[in-house]
Amino acid sequence: TSGKDGSHTFSARLNTIFRECITGFDYAQNMVVIKTMPGLASAAASAIDAMNMSVVLGTLAGDDTVFVVMRDSNSAAAFCGEIRTLLN
C-alpha cells in the first residue's frame, strides 16, 4: 500500500513471500536486483506487481532473480531499505 507521502509499506502477502524466498538484493541507480531461492522469482515479482506501487515501473523475473525498475534512485534505495527491515 502507498502512504500519502508516496512511500509504500509491504502487505502481509509480500512480507511472507519475501521472508520465505529472498536470498539477497541490491540496487544501482533506479534498478533493484532481488535474488531468490530457485523457482521463486516469479512469485516475488507477482507480489511486487500486485501492490501497484507508483514508484515501480515494472518487474522482470527469471528462475531465481527479479529485476525491478524503479522510478528513481531514491525509490530504489527506499525499497531496498524496506526489504532489509523486513528480512531482519
Q: Which residue stretches match the model-derived regions?
A:
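Non-DNA-binding regulatory cores of transcription-related proteins
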Residues: 4-80, 84-86
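Short, basic/aromatic recognition patches that contact phosphate-bearing ligands
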Residues: 1
